[in-house]
C-alpha cells in the first residue's frame, strides 16, 4: 500500500464512525495531506505526522499484520491505521 492509497482510504471514511479492534469509536480526517484521528473518548484530533504514517506503511507492507502492537514503536496511532488498511 502506498501513502497515496492510505490518504484515499482516509478520505473515503472521513467523518464516518469507525471502531478499533477493541471496539473504541473514532473518526478519521485529513489535514495538510496527513491523516488525523479523533477518538470519541476525548473528542480531540491527534496525528503524529506523515513520517509516522510512512513508517507504519513500510512495516505494514513488510509484515501485513493487523495487530496494533506490531506497530507500537513506529506510531502511536497504530490502532487507527490498522482499521483503515483492513478496509482497503
Task: Name every feature range the model reports, one short phrase each.
Residues 1-88:
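Intrinsically disordered, charged low-complexity linkers and terminal tails
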Amino acid at each position: 500500500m502506498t501513502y497515496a492509497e492510505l490518504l484515499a482510504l482516509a478520505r473515503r471514511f472521513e467523518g464516518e464512525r469507525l471502531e478499533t479492534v477493541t471496539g473504541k469509536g473514532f473518526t478519521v480526517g485529513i489535514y495538510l495531506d496527513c491523516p488525523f484521528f479523533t477518538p470519541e473518548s476525548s473528542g480531540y484530533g491527534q496525528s503524529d505526522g506523515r513520517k509516522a504514517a510512512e513508517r507504519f506503511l513500510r512495516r505494514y507492507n513488510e509484515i501485513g499484520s493487523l495487530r496494533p502492537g506490531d506497530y507500537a514503536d513506529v506510531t502511536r496511532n497504530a490502532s487507527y491505521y490498522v482499521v483503515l488498511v483492513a478496509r482497503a
